C-alpha cells in the first residue's frame, strides 16, 4: 500500500496576551473545517458571540504530546486574547489548535490517502458498508455466490444498479492487487485472492484496509483513496466528525466516484445517497426517522478544492527536497511519516494576496517589459531560519517550475551590502569612512576593461560609506571592493550562507551573480540575524 505522509502547517498557539482577535481566530477555525454551532458538545465545533468564542478542540497528536479533545472559552479585547479557560472555568496556560493539513509527500502512482486507524473511524461507516455493499461480510469466506445472484435480480427489478455482487474483500483485492479489466480470468483471480486474504487476516483488518484503500474520487492528477482523505476532500474535516448524511454520501460514491461525483453531478449524488439511507433504515442500521432527517439535508460538500494534490506546492517542494536530503528514500515512501512544517497559513495567504496585487498593478502599467511578469515570495524568520511562506510563481496554487528554488537570476544591487560588510569586517573601515565615488578601471584577463558607471552617469567624489550604500553608488562600491579584495567579498557571500563562493570577477561586486530567491533569502536572513547563520528550513 502507498502510505501517504501527512504534512501539516504550523499550529496556532493560544495563550493570554497573544496578539489575536476574535475575527482572526474564527477565520483559523473555519480554515481547519470547524463548524459554527449553537452547541459545542462535539470536537470540531465553535460558537462566537461578540468577543467571546467557545470552541471544542479536536484531539491531535503533536510531535511532543497527545493533546486530548477539550472545550475552551476564549475572550478577546482590543486585538488580544484576554482570557483562556477550560469547561470548568479554570485558567489554561497554553493550548494549541490542531494544525492545517497542507498536503502529502511522496504518494506513488498518483495516489493519495490519509491512513486512519479503527479508532478514527465512526462506527456507522463499517456498518453502512456492510449494509450496502456486502450484507454477509461477517459470515462469508471472501466470496458470496448468493449475493451475486441476489444483486443480479435486484438490479433487474429496479432497472438500475442498486446492489453489487462483489464482497468487500473482492473489492479490496481488485483495488489493491488487480487492474480494472472485466474478464472472466480476472474475476476468477479476484475470487481466489479474496479467499486467501480471508484465510490470512481477520475481518476487522480487512475492513480497515478497505476503508483506507478504496478509490473515492479524483483531485486533479491525484487519485483520492480511502475514506480518511475523501472526508477531507469532500467535506474539509476529519472522518471521525462526519454525520449520518455525510457518511452515507461517501458510501454512495463507492459505487461510481466519477458518476456520482457530488460536485459535478449533485442530482445523481443526492439520489444515490438517499438510496443508501433507505437501505440503512431497511437493515435497521439507523431508524427510519434518522434516515428521513438525513435525506432532507443538503450534500454538504465544500464548494471547491485545490487541484494538484497540495495546498501550497512551492512550499511542499521545499519540504520534499529537505526530507530527501535528511532521510532515506525508502523511509519517506514506506514509513507513513507525520511531517510538521514551518508554514504559517495566514502569512502565506497574505503573501499570495500581496503578490497578486503587485502583479496586477504591473500588468496594468504601460511598460512593455511588465507584461507577463512572474513573481516569487520567500518569507523567513531570521532568528530560527524557518521558512514561513513561499510562492513559486504567478499562480501560487499550481504545480510546476518552482522559481523560488530554481530560477537563478543576477541579483544586482542586492550584492552591494555584502561589499560593505566585507569592508567593515576588516576593521579598517567604519560607516563614516570616506570612499571615492570616482570612475574606476580594471583590466580583465581577456584584455577587456571593466568600467562600471553610476545609474545617473555621474560621479560624486568623496562620500561616506553610509552614503554610498544608501544611494547604491556603483563607482564607490567598485573602488571600495577593489581596496578590500575580491577574494574577501566572495568569502563574505559564503559566510552568509551561500554554499559556494561566487567566481571572483569584478562584475560580482555590482550583482552579476546568478542566485535563486531562496539563496538570497538565506544571505539576508543571516544579515538580519546579526550575522548568525540559521540554515533555512521548512520542517
Range-by-range predicted roles:
Residues 118, 161, 220, 262-266, ...:
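Alpha-helix N-cap/helix-initiation motif
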Residues 1-364, 386-387, 438, 443, ...:
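Juxtamembrane regions of bacterial inner-membrane/periplasmic proteins
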Residues 421:
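Extracellular glycan-interaction surfaces
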Residues 170-171, 224, 240, 281-400, ...:
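Beta-lactam-recognizing serine transpeptidase/beta-lactamase-like catalytic domain environment
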